């Protein structure tokens, strides 16, 4: 990902670091996190910490998927819990990121001195059948479940996941499946 970013924006400096310990060299005009912070524990501490790096008149801008309770993610957890891989995947099921209520983010950042805007939006993606839904999550939500498995187990896991997905997302007349994808947006200004 960073190599691709360097190619696209060669004048910028990209550094791979752990966001939980990262500290900028100087206050920043913009701290932008797109679909990254949901993987962090302890949002009550981490978001105010990140806001602390924002310069005067600067912004912390965050977008996080809030999909834990969506049928797609319930299917992943069910598939993980019921297959022959259940014991190996149990820690992953327990470690699924939990996004707090939007009111919590407001309170945490307002207490840190931010002027906060927070809202949710649900995007609806028209995907090519159940396979389109599985493909959509193959590089994101399914990764923690698939990575520990052997190739044949991955195939079996995906087959079971497809079955669970099909029970929740029926195709439309044109064969498309409508996938709701809720997101949380936060803009915190100093």
Describe each model-derived feature in a short phrase.
Residues 1-24, 30, 44-45, 49:
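Class I SAM-dependent methyltransferase SAM/SAH-binding core
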Residues 2-13, 77, 106, 110, ...:
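Class I S-adenosyl-L-methionine
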Residues 6, 10, 41, 55, ...:
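Short conserved AdoMet
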Residues 25, 96-190:
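Conserved Class I S-adenosyl-L-methionine
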Residues 29-44, 66:
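A short SAM/SAH-binding and catalytic strip from SAM-dependent methyltransferases
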Residues 44-45, 51, 55-128, 150:
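Conserved catalytic/acceptor-binding region of the Class I
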């Amino acid at each position: 990902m960073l190599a691709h970013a360097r190619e696209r924006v060669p004048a910028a400096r990209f550094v791979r670091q752990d966001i939980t310990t990262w500290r900028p060299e100087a206050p920043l005009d913009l701290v932008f996190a797109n679909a990254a912070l949901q993987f962090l524990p302890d949002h009550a501490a981490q978001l105010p910490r990140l806001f602390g790096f924002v310069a005067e008149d600067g912004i912390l801008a965050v977008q996080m998927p809030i999909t834990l309770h969506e049928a797609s993610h319930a299917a992943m957890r069910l598939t993980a819990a019921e297959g022959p891989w259940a014991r190996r995947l149990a820690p992953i099921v327990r470690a699924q990121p939990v996004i707090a209520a939007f009111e919590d983010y407001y309170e945490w950042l307002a207490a840190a001195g931010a002027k906060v805007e927070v809202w949710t939006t649900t995007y609806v993606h028209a995907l090519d059948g159940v396979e389109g839904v599985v493909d959509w999550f193959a590089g994101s939500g399914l990764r923690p479940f698939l990575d520990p498995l052997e190739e044949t187990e991955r195939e079996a896991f995906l087959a079971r996941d497809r079955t669970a997905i099909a029970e929740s997302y029926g195709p439309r007349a044109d064969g498309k499946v409508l996938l709701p994808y809720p997101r949380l947006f936060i803009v915190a200004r100093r």
